[in-house]
A protein has these predicted regions:
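Short loop/turn motifs at secondary-structure junctions
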Residues: 18-20, 59, 96, 252
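Active-site-proximal segments of metal-dependent phosphoesterases and phosphodiesterases across multiple
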Residues: 28-45, 54-102
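Substrate-binding and catalytic surfaces of secreted/luminal carbohydrate-active proteins
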Residues: 47, 52, 132
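Conserved beta-sheet core of the metallophosphoesterase superfamily
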Residues: 78-160
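Non-catalytic terminal accessory segments
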Residues: 164-278
C-alpha cells in the first residue's frame, strides 16, 4: 500500500503512476459490530491528506467502500448508505472526484448525487456504482476499463460457467447450460418463498402472483430496466392489486418497478472527467 490509515483498515493502492485506488474501511466495529457503515472522523482527515497529495500530483483517485455512499433503493431504505454519508460526499466532492464504487446493497445501481431536487442533470455530482452480488443469478461482475483517451468505462458481465464446464469436460447438464439452469433456480427459489406468504387464493392465482414478483426481483437485482407499464398490465400484477392491495410485498414490487426506470449495467465516464483530466 502507498499509504495506510492508522485508525482503520483503509489504505491507498497505486494502480500505476497516474491512478490510485482509495480503499475505505466503512465498517463499524466498536463498541460492537454494526450493519450500518460509517467513515471515522480520523479516517476522513487521512482521506483529506491523501486526496490533497493526489491533486498536487495530478493523480486520478477511485474510492471504493463496502457500504453505499448514496441512498439508491426505495425497497431498502435503511442500513445501506453510510451514517455520515453527507460528510463523505462533501469531502470527495471537494476534490471533484467523479466516481465511487460500493457493494452492501448488492443491487446493480448507478446514480449521480444531486445536492437538491431540480439540479440540472449536467451539473457536477459524484456518481456511485453499486455492484450486485456475484452469487445471485445472473452472477454478474463489473469490468472497469481505463481507456487511452482518458475515459473510464464500466460494464457488467456474467461469469461464463458453461464455457468453463465445456473446457474442463464436465458432464453436469446444469453447468453446461448454467444460464438457463441458474435462472430457473432463482425463479423457483423466490417463487416458493412468495407462495409461503400468498396462500388460499388458488393454485393458478398464487403461481401467477409469485412468478410476477420473482421476475421483477431478478431484473431489479441485475440492474435491468423494467417495463413498468407492461408489468402492471400483467395478470399476475393485477392479482396482487385485487387480492393483497395492502401487502408489504406489493409495496416492494412497486418500489422495485419504480427504481428500475433505466438500465444500470453500463457506465461511461467521459475523457474530460476521466483519469487524464487536467
Amino acid at each position: 500500500a502507498l499509504s495506510r490509515d492508522s485508525s482503520s483498515l483503509s489504505y491507498v493502492y497505486a494502480l500505476d503512476e497516474k491512478n490510485w485506488l482509495l480503499m475505505l474501511d466503512s465498517c463499524q466495529y466498536e463498541p460492537e459490530n454494526k450493519v450500518e457503515g460509517r467513515i471515522k472522523e480520523s479516517t476522513l482527515a487521512w482521506m483529506d491528506e491523501q486526496l490533497l497529495k493526489a491533486r498536487e500530483q495530478g493523480i486520478f483517485v477511485l474510492p471504493i467502500a463496502h457500504h453505499n455512499l448514496l441512498a439508491q433503493s426505495r425497497m431498502y431504505t435503511t442500513q445501506c448508505a453510510m451514517d455520515n454519508n453527507s460528510e463523505v460526499i462533501d469531502l470527495l466532492q471537494k476534490y471533484r472526484l467523479p466516481l465511487f464504487f460500493s457493494g452492501h446493497l448488492h443491487v446493480q445501481r448507478v446514480r449521480k448525487h444531486k445536492a437538491e431536487p431540480g439540479v440540472d442533470d449536467g451539473a457536477y455530482g459524484i456518481q456511485e456504482i453499486i455492484t450486485d452480488a456475484l452469487s445471485i443469478p445472473p452472477c454478474q461482475y463489473g469490468e472497469v476499463v481505463w481507456d487511452e483517451d482518458g475515459s473510464i468505462s464500466y460494464e457488467t458481465r456474467s461469469v461464463d460457467v458453461s464455457g468453463w464446464a465445456r473446457k474442463t469436460g464436465s458432464g453436469n447438464p446444469d453447468l453446461l447450460d448454467f444460464e438457463d439452469w441458474s435462472y430457473r433456480y432463482i425463479q423457483k427459489l423466490i417463487s416458493d418463498q412468495i407462495r409461503g406468504v400468498v396462500q388460499n387464493l388458488g393454485e393458478d392465482v398464487e403461481r401467477s402472483m409469485a412468478a410476477t414478483y420473482a421476475g421483477v426481483y431478478i431484473d431489479y437485482y441485475a440492474g435491468r430496466k423494467i417495463d413498468a407499464k407492461g408489468i402492471r398490465n400483467t395478470k399476475g400484477y393485477r392479482w396482487w392489486q385485487r387480492n393483497m392491495p395492502d401487502s408489504y410485498l406489493l409495496r416492494e414490487l412497486d418500489s422495485m418497478i419504480t427504481d428500475s426506470d433505466r438500465d444500470n449495467n453500463y457506465f461511461l465516464l467521459p475523457e474530460e472527467e476521466g483519469w487524464l483530466r487536467e
